[in-house]
Amino acid sequence: VIDGIGDQVTSAFSTNTFNKNGSNVPETGFASYVSPHRILLNVGYRLANKNGASNFGLYYEASQLGYIGNYSYSRYSYTMYVQSGNYQNAVTNDRGAVNLLYIPTRSELDGMPFTSDENKEAFWNFIQKDSYLSDHVGEYSKRGGAVMPWYHTLNFRFSQDFYVNVKGKRNTISLGLDVTNLANMLNRNWGNIKRMNTSSILAWDGTNYTFTAPKWSKYASTVSTWSAMFSIRYTFN
């Protein structure tokens, strides 16, 4: 099953057919939007008296979510880039294939030509430190096998209700404050969602391999910043 990412049929085919034997032999695996774990917590408290009521609410969510480029994922696939002409994949001979990365053993790696010994060692060190790659040495990476880091968000709501009597009926005026991503308001280093620049970490030019470590950064968007909204509401009885 293809995740459906892409605004055109051709882009969905060329960028989402993760495999090791060509696009006509697609790999089964986890969809990119399936989060292994998700935690939701909603707490509310209401303090009322004859003149009105104070309402407090906290909403907490934690899930494994991040970005690659401008698309959000819960899972991602480690892949290898093949430099070839006319968009032809030199490994699978397939225009639409995205090569799943083979994770070599130490002995296999020693026999692979790299642009430099330092680059080869950097690749091995990355494998050893990565929780997914280190558990699958000697195998192909799975489609959607790697999981994004945890993302935490905390939202806060406060509203104050004032009761007013209109012709013997109790109406309510409510003043509200909603803060989205409260943690980020308290500390700019909290409540940030991370972005990975690429999951294609190995390149083959027909002669040598080149390893490029992925870079993580803050995803500069509204999901990584706090916001506040004031509201007023009148409720008729």
Feature map (PLM): residue ranges:
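Extracytoplasmic gating/loop element in the C-terminal half of outer-membrane beta-barrel translocons
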Residues: 55-167, 174, 202-203, 209-216
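Gram-negative outer-membrane beta-barrel transporters
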Residues: 1-72
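C-terminal beta-signal and terminal closure region of outer-membrane beta-barrel proteins
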Residues: 187-237
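Residues on the lipid-exposed face of transmembrane beta-strands in outer-membrane beta-barrel proteins
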Residues: 41-45, 156-160, 177-179, 230-234
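Residues that define the transmembrane beta-barrel architecture of outer-membrane proteins
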Residues: 35-39, 150-154, 171, 224-228
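Outer-membrane beta-barrel and related beta-rich outer-membrane complex signature
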Residues: 4-11, 66-85, 187-196
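Outer-membrane beta-barrel strand-turn architecture
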Residues: 35, 47-50, 62, 162-166, ...
